[in-house]
């Protein structure tokens, strides 16, 4: 088993070298073939997904799978349409490989270019969500990265079906290296993959807090991702109530099972009387369970709103991924920011305010990869950010941060073009000086 896994990874690693130099035309042709194949084979995809949903129902009944994961697992006709649209959006994006990032003249006829290039071989490990396969494969293909996929057992039929359809489509177009995309399906394969740091350049895990933490703790391979999505909205005393009601409702209710839905609502005491009762009524009608601190519990109880429960200390650190919301009253914007930076996951947090100085203060102090002003946290998404799709959301402080599109799948190399220059001429008593002059030259124009 271990040797089979390693041979798959080595094959993908070799293919990554060839894939890095495949032309934009060939890559776009392969992407269009992928989109057409998904459309043609959608019936087979939906049938495979039904098998997974039946298995998932058994797992949920046994307490081994949450409703949030079951929701993410489901594939519908509209989701297939979304997969197809996502791939075609990637086709429209400019090929990022080989782009000149900067050009510096060191001396006459000694020019240094900084040029973008693929990372190499990327491992993507994910729970549920079969739509991850076309999303990530399209971005990795366009950015010239070979990819190893490992999905959860609950989505095995869907993942295998979609993966096979896409790989056959890619191979049918010609010009693409064989073996650039591989699929692993067993739990044992995960542990083997995590140990192959000699070949795998980056891991992108997508799943629960515990799942991502497990990956981070059991590999030497760099990991890009976030462990949880504990997102907040702070309703400032200078908020427009109508804006606050619609934004806060959307941020929780529109799709509660995802990582950019809010888990905690922070409300300034000076607007609580005006804002919170109607907001709570909207949430309760939508089936949201409200877990309130003492201040919000007292206010809402006096207004006759129910059912309500009291928040525990643990609630502030929980990612519910469900129709559950914690509510807390705060006295100042600083108290709100301190709460977010203490209990949040640095994913996406927002403020509702009409006050420019409050807005500026919040943006400057909150330590989040995305900050929303008078807009729903649900916008924190690669597709909505114009990236075509995303491989995930990162809360890392280095490399990529926030929704990661193709730019997060690239690094760069330095290329120095000279005419026989040697360092000895630029050292010692009579050393030639460097000019270090920025130039507006592109490496692709070099003869």
From Swiss-Prot:
Biological pathway: Amino-acid biosynthesis; L-proline biosynthesis; L-glutamate 5-semialdehyde from L-glutamate: step 2/2
Any single Pfam family the record assigns to this protein: Aldedh
Main location: cytoplasm
Subcellular location: Cytoplasm
SUPFAM superfamilies reported in the protein's UniProt record: ALDH-like
GO biological process per UniProt: L-proline biosynthetic process
Known EC number: 1.2.1.41
Highest taxon listed in the record's lineage: Archaea
Molecular function via GO: glutamate-5-semialdehyde dehydrogenase activity; NADP binding
Key words of the record: Amino-acid biosynthesis, Cytoplasm, NADP, Oxidoreductase, Proline biosynthesis
Record-level GO cellular component terms: cytoplasm
Annotated PROSITE patterns: PROA
Reaction it catalyzes: L-glutamate 5-semialdehyde + phosphate + NADP(+) = L-glutamyl 5-phosphate + NADPH + H(+)
Annotated family: Belongs to the gamma-glutamyl phosphate reductase family.
Function recorded in the entry: Catalyzes the NADPH-dependent reduction of L-glutamate 5-phosphate into L-glutamate 5-semialdehyde and phosphate. The product spontaneously undergoes cyclization to form 1-pyrroline-5-carboxylate.
UniProt name for this protein: Gamma-glutamyl phosphate reductase
Organism: Methanosarcina mazei (strain ATCC BAA-159 / DSM 3647 / Goe1 / Go1 / JCM 11833 / OCM 88) (Methanosarcina frisia)
Record lineage: Archaea, Methanobacteriati, Methanobacteriota, Stenosarchaea group, Methanomicrobia
